[in-house]
Amino acid sequence: MEALRISLNDYILSGGGANGESYVLKTDPAVMLKLYFPGKVRQPLDEMILARKVFEAGIPTPEPGDYVVTEDGRYGIRFNCIIGKKSYSRAVADDPGNLPRYAEEFAGMCLDLHATHVDTAKFENVKDRYYRLLAESPFFSTGEKDRIGRFISEVPDEDTAIHGDLQFSNAIFAGDKRYFIDLGDFCYGNHLFDVGMVYLCSNLSEDSFIRETFHMPKSLAVRFWRHFAGAYFGEDRSLRDIEEEVLPFAGLKTLIVERDMNQPMPNIRAALEPILR
């Protein structure tokens, strides 16, 4: 796919992140530009192609835009912003009195997502992703990798949608419309791989990380999880039972976090104890 050429002079810098920067069009603030740092050519194209497939699969996500390149050779994606949007993490931080409602709405979105059957020929199996991460990890012994691999293989298969990075900052709403965003890790498989991320972000992450990323103290994030868990799994299940089931899946995120941080992460790795013992 050939990139559409644009001039960065037409845009205003609005923010930055680990992979690049975001801009808004000077003449229309509803038009956003996600511009990757120099050298990243394939990543924005792959992200846009996947975003298009996810959108066409019926997942509630903003419609993807154009694959673009600037005069100096930086690649990115241009798309229309959702006006008046707010993430569920920001909503909880700004309005903790309505936390139960926000948690229930987010749980409803997740239940709908995890009930959506997808064409498995178009997306990656979540198990294959974790097998690959496991093989590449330098932080586990051969015996530990064998036990983790066995656990993954024994998880029941599902052909339903997986967000892949299910943080409650990656779900937004504007009025009565709700969307998932940042679906670069979208795949299919057992829903517990997704729910494990919700638990990790709210219960296993450090308070400082939660404050910086989700704009709230850890105590509030834990409250969100508890309301979410009841709405997602049903009030007839105890929180203890739910967390025992979800904990190993949160622990599997160790493979992603340690890859990104390039060091062991004991606070998250501890969640793998049910698998490794």
Predicted region positions:
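Inter-domain helical "communication" segments and dimerization helices
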Residues: 88-103, 107-111, 115-131, 135, ...
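Short, glycine/acidic-enriched loop or turn micro-motifs at the edges of active sites
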Residues: 83, 166-168, 185, 197
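Catalytic activation segment of kinase domains across protein kinase-like and atypical kinase folds
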Residues: 171-195
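Active-site activation/catalytic loop segments of kinase-like enzymes and analogous catalytic loops
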Residues: 195-236, 249-266
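ATP-binding pocket architecture of kinase catalytic cores
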Residues: 12-14, 18-120
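Conserved N-terminal boundary motif of the eukaryotic protein kinase catalytic domain
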Residues: 5-13
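Regulatory N- and C-terminal appendages and interdomain linkers associated
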Residues: 1-3, 264-277
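An alpha-helical support segment within catalytic cores of ATP-dependent transferases
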Residues: 1-4, 115-164, 168-169, 174-175
